[in-house]
């Protein structure tokens, strides 16, 4: 048995959905432990493109239990829309389970999120406007609505009365918006609760039951390390903890249950929204990476900012998450570039540093120090074994592995499941006998 956490090692959008889908074949249970509909992942199966925001990738495997954990925030409208889409595509959803203690994104959360972002103007954070931050804020202030509250009308009414009065006052007085009608909100969310009720479970109990039965459990993170509320590029971060430690809190398990942590990183770097990005490119190279890599957000449709691979944040992700190995995605996007640059350090106020600065203002002043590697300028899309890769592509991967001081277990060369090279079984294989110099 092996219990594995999969995390993003950059700013999100690393291709975790595909890697989780690949690893789900060996998993009995897949747990989404944080985030909400602000995250999105795209999976391609037999040429069919499926875009999901809340439902774990493992839903495509009929014998796999997919659990949305207590650390997530759930928008029932989006979740039910995804379930309907899966049913229409002939996918069995009977294995889906939803934590009774997960918090619920209410209509006022979305309205306030969008209004606050507009009010920030040039100081905007770049939120998705889906209400994630306000939902987590209410959770911290102990005034949130949980999934279990949607199953009982009186409990929902009691829980909602105070918060809705407060939110309506904000909407009207501060933002000049119309108030929400309590009876309409209650009726709408009770209807959601009725549809979700068959899937609602005690999250921690379900996971520990699987662990006692020696099941393989895969914990799926959303977003990425540099968007972590505590360890990312604050304030340009999400409102939860995508790092591996967040799996324990968001799923209700202890750290001794985790056997291995796998990081996912693109062969280059992207970021969506605002915030510092030292290796960001402009001009034709940025356009090439964006167009060739299809760098448009699953959730927002926004064009992602693109840049060279940043080994400084890569090493930071290894340390913060305790990575055992790495999956490198979108190597094929670099196929046509003649010279590749990799950031190995920063120049900050005239000094060379090799660590990620905790101060966002200092990070914004960092200039990348690059090493240049030759490109391979031929297609890798059809490579299925490590030895099929061009030597220069192999050299690039070895350089990344050495720079980050972590072995590479998986190389992804496209969106489809079969466009993957598994160097070593990342779950059951030896922890350090993978691709390195």
Curated annotation (Swiss-Prot):
- Identify the InterPro entries for this entry: Adenylosuccin_syn_GTP-bd, Adenylosuccin_syn_Lys_AS, Adenylosuccinate_synth_dom1, Adenylosuccinate_synth_dom2, Adenylosuccinate_synth_dom3, Adenylosuccinate_synthetase, P-loop_NTPase
As for subcellular location, the record says:
Cytoplasm
Q: Name one GO molecular function term.
A: GTP binding
Listed binding positions for IMP are: 13-16, 38-41, 128, 142, 223, 238, 302
User: Which parts of the sequence bind GTP?
Assistant: 12-18, 40-42, 304, 330-332, 412-414
Q: Which domain of life is it from?
A: Bacteria
Where is Mg(2+) bound in this sequence? 13, 40
Q: Where is the active site?
A: 13, 41
* Gene3D superfamilies in alphabetical order: Adenylosuccinate Synthetase, subunit A, domain 1, Adenylosuccinate Synthetase, subunit A, domain 2, Adenylosuccinate Synthetase, subunit A, domain 3
Q: Where is this region: Disordered?
A: 119-138
Task: Report any one BP term from Gene Ontology.
Answer: 'de novo' AMP biosynthetic process
**Which HAMAP family did the record assign?**
Adenylosucc_synth
Subunit and partners: Homodimer.
List the protein's name.
Answer: Adenylosuccinate synthetase
Q: Which organism is it from?
A: Synechococcus sp. (strain WH7803)
Name of encoding gene: purA
